[in-house]
């Protein structure tokens, strides 16, 4: 019998993120940065604003990592024949597939995540830093988190730079500024990664596609026979639908509408 309960990987990742976030913030306050100078001069507006942004980014991170990303639930089959409007919403050209892992009927754009062991609607990817999937329900919050986190990282980068002192003997510099310089390098790396992630996700959202669809379109049944994205309604409408709330309608319906528009243009 185990003396300790098994460690939850999600709890470890979230605890590590929280400790790292407040640890970096503490370093910026303890060293001779603009943040500390503002505090000593009694100018508390900017330090409090920075702390509020850090706290907001942390709460948003926890919200995205803990919320349901859009798991596909088992729904009972309706009694008798389906209603006419329900049948029209799922055309025969786009049959629903049963997941061979969890045995649920997968809506269009859903995928089974082996890490979460669940099917996720409009699956984008499984984020190891969140220890959660990014899907239909939490993808907008995920992009908002990336934007806010980038602001915090860039501001923290400027604050760390303001406290670096280069004109000192090597030994003295290492003792007084070594930890701050390490923090500066960490912030630089994280800012670059988050900026690239934010840019790529905004690009994909503007095209109404997901990371999984973008990378694996040649293997996805509803995309490999097409020359264009059946869900793309133009950048403005795609962004509006994404940030103003899901769902914008069953994806099967949008796919069918795209086919009808294409056939009418040919005629």
UniProtKB/Swiss-Prot annotation:
Q: Which GO terms describe its molecular function?
A: protein-cysteine S-palmitoyltransferase activity
Knockout phenotype, as recorded, reads:
Mice display enhanced inflammatory symptoms and lethality following alum-induced peritonitis and LPS-induced endotoxic shock; defects are caused by an increased NLRP3 inflammasome activation.
Where found, per UniProt?
Golgi apparatus membrane; Endoplasmic reticulum membrane
UniProt GO BP:
gephyrin clustering involved in postsynaptic density assembly; negative regulation of NLRP3 inflammasome complex assembly; peptidyl-L-cysteine S-palmitoylation; positive regulation of synaptic transmission, GABAergic
Catalysed reaction(s) here are: L-cysteinyl-[protein] + hexadecanoyl-CoA = S-hexadecanoyl-L-cysteinyl-[protein] + CoA
Q: What is its EC number?
A: 2.3.1.225
Q: Which residues form the DHHC domain?
A: 97-147
**Active site (catalytic residues):** 127
The record gives the membrane topology as: Multi-pass membrane protein
Q: What is known of its domains?
A: The DHHC domain is required for palmitoyltransferase activity.
UniProt lists the family membership as follows:
Belongs to the DHHC palmitoyltransferase family.
UniProt-recorded name of the protein: Palmitoyltransferase ZDHHC12
Q: What is the originating organism of this protein?
A: Mus musculus
């Amino acid at each position: 019998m185990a003396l300790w309960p098994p460690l939850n990987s999600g709890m470890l990742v979230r605890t590590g993120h929280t400790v790292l976030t407040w640890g970096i913030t503490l370093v910026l306050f303890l060293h001779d940065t603009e943040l500390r100078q503002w505090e000593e001069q009694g100018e508390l507006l900017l330090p409090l604003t920075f702390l509020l942004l850090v706290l907001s980014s942390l709460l948003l991170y926890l919200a995205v990592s803990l919320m349901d990303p859009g798991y596909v639930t088992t729904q009972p089959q309706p009694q008798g024949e389906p209603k006419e409007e329900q049948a029209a919403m799922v055309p025969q050209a786009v049959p629903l597939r049963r997941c061979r892992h969890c045995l649920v009927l997968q809506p269009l754009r859903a995928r089974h995540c082996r890490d979460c062991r669940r099917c996720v609607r409009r699956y984008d990817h499984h984020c190891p830093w969140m220890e959660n999937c990014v899907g239909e329900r939490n993808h907008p919050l995920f992009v908002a988190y990336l934007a806010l986190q980038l602001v915090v990282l860039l501001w923290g980068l400027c604050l760390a730079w303001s406290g670096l002192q280069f004109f000192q003997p090597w030994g003295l510099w290492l003792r007084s500024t070594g930890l701050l310089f390490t923090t500066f390098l960490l912030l630089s790396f994280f800012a670059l990664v988050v900026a690239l992630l934010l840019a790529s996700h905004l690009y994909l959202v503007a095209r109404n596609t997901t990371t999984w669809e973008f990378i694996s379109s040649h293997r996805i049944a509803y995309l490999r026979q097409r020359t264009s994205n059946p869900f793309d309604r133009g950048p403005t409408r795609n962004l509006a639908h994404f940030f103003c709330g899901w769902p914008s309608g069953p994806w099967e319906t949008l796919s069918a509408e795209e086919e009808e528009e294409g056939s009418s243009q040919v005629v």
